[in-house]
């Protein structure tokens, strides 16, 4: 999703997401003089022409172009979109086909793709990355509300993790059913008693948001382990901004670079060696679905891209294997989910992690972003309990609401949800391995009233592919 991005010093970790540099002579696609059937006569006419061309949203949906519910919105464009089409001008309309071709060409040249699970399993398929020509424009007031809500939810997640791996007052007070926490495989007992550097469990998080017919944003899902998107966001922004340079300048779209600097600086500040820290990016490998962005993000941030076999843990410290010998590692930005991080304490069949990594993390000798143990927060069953947790832990009301959801492991919630079944989406509370009788416990499903399921970023297929290869 492209839109107005916030300054990096205030950037919510979830929305600092998605670049590859590709400079060519036509990158800026300035408005060349040309004969066109779309000669609207003036810049203002271009905005009216855009409004006439754009089909209205489906009834019951929010009309982004016109800024209102489909049945209630006027025929005119929302101010931000009017400004965009005005900057585009009449020649810009005539040039849209060429810009669309340029977008596809740049994605191919930059290798921008998503590798679906079947490729990792040996199918060889590569899914082209999907990117719309026109960006989603989020007005400053809307973005400020999203920013406040996301930052608040990150603070809440940090407070929940600190409590559940510490004093566990949440469970003692009955604010969360134990089955949703200790029964979930994402709750890692090896992290009990661990201290998060600076109180920060989550350095990066991702939130799936949707806008309702009333224009309000709602949370659909949250991703807390090693969420994907930071590299794709940058690539999307670079490509689209070069296709519409005048519009991006005219709308004063906020920059992204400061957000990435802030992420790196915060990791340096919290890692053992501070500014002299060596930070690496841990990837499952080239079979991972989002390996493209792992490689790009490491290059953009100036980090060494490593796999589990490139690291070793000795004496509660982590080292990088080099031709010059072992070199200390002080920070790890990971793109490997929790269960695969350490075969000694987590999944014994993992080939993606580092034996002894968990011990080094608990000893405080290496910063792991994000800290392991937040997987249970990704369960859709927990969403309905977050408002009262915010009141209990932060003494605040959540400003960014989630879709209405019920955890059907409680009889009262199940009775309330069943009559609404035809209008909602049923999601599993626990991963498939637990549903099939694997490790973990508890049961029940989570039901959402409306929306689309948000798929958590999982990459165990890389381990299967590596074992097969």
Feature-to-residue mapping (PLM):
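Preference for protein termini
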Residues: 2-7, 15-469
């Amino acid at each position: 999703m492209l839109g107005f991005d916030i300054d990096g010093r205030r950037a919510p970790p979830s929305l600092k997401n998605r670049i590859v540099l590709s400079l060519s002579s036509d990158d800026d696609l300035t408005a060349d003089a040309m004969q066109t059937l779309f000669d609207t006569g003036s810049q203002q006419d271009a905005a009216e022409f855009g409004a006439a061309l754009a089909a209205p949203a489906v009834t019951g949906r929010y009309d982004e172009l016109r800024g209102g519910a489909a049945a209630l919105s006027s025929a005119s464009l929302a101010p931000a979109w009017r400004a965009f089409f005005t900057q585009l001008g009449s020649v810009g309309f005539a040039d849209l086909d060429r810009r669309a071709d340029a977008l596809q060409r740049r994605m191919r040249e930059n290798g921008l793709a998503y590798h679906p699970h079947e490729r990792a399993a040996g199918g060889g398929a590569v899914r082209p990355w999907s990117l719309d020509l026109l960006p989603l424009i989020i007005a400053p007031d809307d973005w400020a509300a999203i920013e406040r809500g996301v930052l608040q939810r990150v603070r809440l997640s940090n407070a929940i993790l600190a409590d559940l791996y510490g004093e566990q007052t949440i469970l003692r007070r009955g604010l969360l059913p134990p089955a949703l926490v200790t029964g979930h495989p994402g709750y890692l007992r090896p992290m009990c008693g661990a201290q998060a550097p600076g109180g920060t469990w989550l350095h990066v998080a991702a939130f799936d948001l949707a806008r309702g017919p009333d224009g309000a944003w709602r949370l659909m899902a949250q991703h807390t382990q090693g969420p994907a998107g930071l590299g794709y966001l940058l690539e999307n922004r670079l490509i689209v901004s070069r296709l519409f340079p005048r519009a991006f300048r005219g709308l004063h779209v906020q920059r992204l670079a400061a957000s990435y600097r802030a992420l790196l600086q915060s990791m340096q500040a919290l890692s053992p060696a501070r500014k002299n820290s060596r930070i690496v990016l841990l990837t499952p490998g080239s079979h991972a679905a989002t390996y493209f962005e792992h490689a790009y993000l490491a290059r953009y941030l100036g980090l060494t891209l490593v796999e589990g076999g490139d690291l070793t843990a000795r004496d509660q410290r982590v080292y990088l294997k080099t031709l010059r010998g072992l070199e200390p590692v002080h920070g790890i930005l990971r793109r490997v989910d929790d269960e695969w991080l350490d075969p000694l304490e987590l999944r014994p069949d993992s080939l993606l992690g580092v034996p002894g990594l968990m011990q080094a993390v608990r000893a405080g000798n290496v910063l792991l972003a994000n800290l392991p143990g937040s997987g249970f927060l990704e369960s859709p069953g927990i969403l309905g309990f977050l408002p009262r947790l915010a009141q209990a832990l932060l003494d605040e009301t959540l400003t960014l609401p989630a879709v209405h959801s019920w955890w059907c492991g409680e009889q009262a919630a199940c009775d309330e949800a069943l009559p609404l079944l035809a209008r909602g989406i049923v999601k599993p509370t626990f991963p498939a391995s637990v549903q099939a009788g694997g490790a973990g416990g508890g049961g029940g499903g989570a039901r959402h009233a409306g929306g689309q399921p948000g798929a958590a970023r999982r990459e165990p297929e890389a381990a299967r592919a590596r074992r097969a290869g």
